[in-house]
Amino acid sequence: MGAVVIGGCSNDDLNINFDDENAIDFSVTVPRSPRTATTTESINEFSVWAFVDGNKFMDNVTVVKNNNSWQYSPTMYWPADDKAVNFYSISPKIPKSEATVVNTPGTPDITGYTNTDGTTDLLYAVNMDETAGTTSVVKVNFRHALSQLQFNVRRYSSDATSPLRVEVKSLELLNVYSKGNLTMPRQTTGISGENLSSWSSQSEPNSPVIYDGNVVVLDNDNPVELNSTGYMFALPQTLVPSVTSASASVQGAYVRVLCAVYDQESGVKLWPSQTTQGYSDGMAYLYFPLSTSGSSVKEWRPGYAYRYNITIGVPAGSSVIDFDVTVDGYKDFGNLDI
């Protein structure tokens, strides 16, 4: 099982104009994503905070897209004397009880954010030192705060072994954190640059289900993506090391697949047997570690996408049919006279 990190780039701006030239206006961009996620075209609203001289100027104001323009109420105006304004934006909008942007370096902006079902693409944007004299429109370039996940499965294939048929019923993650504190950078998140958010105090490990549906049959070498629940966004985190205890229990971050393996030509089941741990309805779980000493990826970073390619074969420890060959010698019947 491997991981591939995929990058992205930004779309064009959606610009707006207000009648009052001194009002604070916004334009919005969102980085492209390799899969279904929020984009410049699909984002519809965000929350914004603003600070002047360290004092709160806008407090969790909801900005909504209406006919390709961004509107909010009440309209805010640029401060006098060309004073700088720092803007912090989050999408989708966050309840006031959950967001505590304070414009202080190192202080979390969202505390206790919970990634409940992995379907929300959380975005953030920062605009520092904007002034009326230099800023006609606040160009808000959002970045993805979470990590995006994709899981592909395929059967093991080798010229040295008989072809396999694999049946998969479910796929889930084990022991990944679902709650944490988000801190936005104190630098402008422009289209270029690597000013990323950071996460801290990750907690509440859970085991989200990625796929649970009809049996998927793997009978060729083409990979199949599994996702029936919509879970594709995970909390950035250092993955808990994957270990197996002496009691055969797993600890740490794993992918768990409920499956069965057959010989393709004869249809004979090769794994699991009825004595396999966790055996149920002809299937059992295979475990694939996410974080070991040899793993190429041991953490999920904000704004990165990870594609896990899982190859399923006959598990290690299963009995291979070997042959020990002997040939009986011909019996000596002696000499026969005819």
Residue ranges and their predicted role:
Residues P105-N127, L270-G313:
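Short beta-strand elements
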Residues V5-G8:
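C-terminal motif of bacterial Sec signal peptides marking the signal peptidase cleavage site
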Residues D12-V28, T40, S291-I338:
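Short, polar/proline-rich extracytoplasmic segments that appear immediately after membrane translocation
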Residues N11-S178, P185-G190, E194, S198, ...:
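Short, low-hydrophobicity acidic/polar segments
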Residues M1-A3:
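Sec-dependent N-terminal signal peptides
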